[in-house]
């Protein structure tokens, strides 16, 4: 969990100081991505490209120019996606070729690209989905509110990017723990005694299952909440209300960063419970 900041000398900085600098740079661009904001990004991008550093072939000087764009870089990436050649195409330098931008076209391209991809018989999207599924995807794209609100959101973005690691690690560790809950009776050759007792097949078994699920619940939520608050405490809580499309342009889920976090947390929990039950 960390960010990189390119300073005025073209050198990379990391650590909490880099986080603070990136937050400050991106907060300067906070606001709705309307016509005025998009035009400002295009103009600033063109101004930087016209500098000696922006035109230099020297990697060090070129990095200085890249550093100047860090404040609006996520917005520039959206322009790359919107004005790309198609739904599945990407070119880092697309935004550099855009001299005039339209708010309507910027958001409209997202819908146009997915429609073309789904209806082009020569593309994989045409045969990948049924007509009802295509209609649903397009409806979801059209239902997304615009303009987007931009704010520093690196904490939430990195949290969502890495959130799947903890459940996978938890499944691995808890799998070993859960595996012994019932198998130990057979290992110790006590199963005949255990299951022949008055409550061996009922209350005792039920208690073991409940204890196993409780263990999964406590370990999972403790680990996930600690990781989440550590990440957000270090990188920042700002940007919770930003839509996920600020970083995942093609997403058909019209939810915010914090809603995606809640969804990911519960999906991971259900997955852990299922695998724990399966292991037991």
Where do the PLM segments sit?
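Membrane-proximal extracellular/periplasmic loop immediately following the first transmembrane helix
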Residues: 2-117
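Secretory targeting signals
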Residues: 2-29, 106-185, 206-279
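Hydrophobic transmembrane alpha-helix segments characteristic of membrane transport
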Residues: 188-192
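Long, hydrophobic, well-ordered secondary-structure blocks that form the structural core
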Residues: 193-194, 217
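Generic transmembrane alpha-helix motif of multi-pass integral membrane proteins
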Residues: 194-195, 278-280
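Short helix-to-coil transition segments within interhelical loops
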Residues: 195-201
């Amino acid at each position: 969990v960390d960010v990189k900041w390119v300073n005025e000398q073209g050198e990379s900085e990391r650590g909490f100081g880099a986080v603070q600098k990136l937050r400050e740079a991106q907060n300067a661009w906070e606001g709705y991505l309307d016509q005025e904001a998009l035009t400002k990004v295009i103009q600033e991008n063109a101004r930087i490209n016209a500098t000696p550093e922006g035109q230099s072939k020297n990697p060090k000087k070129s990095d200085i120019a890249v550093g100047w764009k860090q404040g609006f870089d996520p917005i520039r990436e959206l322009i790359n996606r919107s004005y790309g050649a198609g739904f599945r195409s990407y070119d880092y330098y697309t935004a550099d070729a855009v001299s005039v931008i339209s708010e309507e076209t910027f958001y409209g391209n997202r819908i146009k690209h997915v429609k073309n991809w789904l209806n082009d018989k020569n593309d994989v999207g045409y045969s990948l989905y049924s007509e009802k599924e295509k209609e649903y995807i397009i409806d979801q794209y059209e239902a997304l509110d615009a303009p987007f609100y931009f704010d520093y959101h690196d904490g939430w973005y990195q949290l969502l990017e890495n959130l799947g690691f903890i459940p996978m690690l938890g499944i691995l560790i808890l799998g070993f723990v859960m595996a012994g809950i019932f198998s130990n009776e057979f290992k110790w050759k006590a199963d005949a005694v255990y299951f022949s007792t008055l409550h061996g097949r009922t209350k005792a078994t039920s208690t073991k299952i409940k204890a196993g699920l409780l263990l999964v619940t406590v370990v999972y939520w403790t680990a996930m909440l600690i990781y989440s608050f550590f990440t957000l405490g270090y990188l920042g809580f700002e940007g919770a209300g930003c839509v996920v499309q600020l970083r995942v342009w093609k997403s058909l889920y019209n939810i915010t960063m914090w809603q995606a976090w809640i969804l990911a947390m519960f999906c991971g929990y259900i997955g852990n419970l299922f695998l724990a039950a399966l292991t037991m």
